């Protein structure tokens, strides 16, 4: 769905984090226009993206998990938000569950906040209770962090802040980066 929904002029690049299955052969056969950046081993979410993005020159970095589905037209509002708001460093869509398209995705949903103890929580989920999507997060809104599952940021800000902290192999790296964006 990513290749089909990509606007003209957007290059789709897959960062292969040391896969050992036949996924790259399937990718090459099904999507020859996709560029693949291969890594020698799994560097984790943070390390893998940091290594891949060192080789990509762009105004924006759009990071998508491999299981994210993208409908037609989904990227335009995100890029428009960043274009209209030069002080916004990162933007993201709300994430709907693939298993139940009436509910938010468990991981990230619609961005989130940090409480006074430093605990991150997200819109669309309270602890283990996932909300139904009733349009309550269709608005453009400032949040403290967005999910790394679908993360669109200014490349210059990403580079200036040193990218993701590689000490986070997987999980919470996007919250850390968004926190550093807030402080910058």
Regions found by a protein language model. Name each.
Residues 61:
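Short aromatic/hydrophobic "clamp" motif used to bind/position activated sugar donors
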Residues 112-143:
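Short, flexible, basic/aromatic active-site loop/helix in glycosyltransferases
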Residues 1-9:
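Short, acidic, metal-binding catalytic loop of nucleotide-sugar glycosyltransferases
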Residues 72-119:
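Conserved donor NDP-sugar-binding/catalytic core segment of glycosyltransferases
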Residues 138-184:
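A short, conserved alpha-helix in the catalytic core of glycosyltransferases
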Residues 16-25, 41:
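A conserved acidic beta->alpha catalytic loop
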Residues 39-56, 66:
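Glycine-rich, basic loop-to-helix element that forms the pyrophosphate-binding segment
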Residues 43, 68-69, 88, 95, ...:
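Acidic metal-phosphate-binding loop of nucleotide-sugar-dependent transferases
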């Amino acid at each position: 769905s990513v290749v089909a929904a990509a606007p003209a002029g957007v290059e789709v690049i897959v960062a292969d984090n040391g896969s050992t299955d036949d996924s790259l052969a399937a990718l090459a056969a099904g999507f020859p226009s996709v560029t693949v950046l291969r890594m020698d081993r799994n560097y984790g979410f943070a390390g893998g993206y940091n290594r891949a993005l060192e080789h990509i020159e762009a105004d924006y970095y759009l990071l998508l998990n491999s299981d994210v589905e993208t409908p037609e037209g989904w990227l335009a509002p995100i890029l428009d938000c960043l274009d209209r708001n030069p002080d916004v460093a990162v933007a993201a869509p709300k994430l709907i569950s693939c298993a139940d398209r009436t509910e938010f995705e468990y991981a990230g949903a619609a961005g989130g906040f940090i409480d006074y103890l430093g605990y991150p929580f997200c819109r669309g989920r309270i602890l283990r209770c996932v909300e139904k999507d009733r349009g309550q997060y269709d608005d453009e809104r400032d949040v403290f962090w967005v999910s790394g599952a679908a993360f669109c940021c200014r490349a210059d800000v990403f580079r200036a802040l040193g990218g993701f902290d590689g000490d986070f192999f997987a999980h919470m790296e996007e919250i850390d980066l968004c926190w550093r964006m807030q402080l910058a």
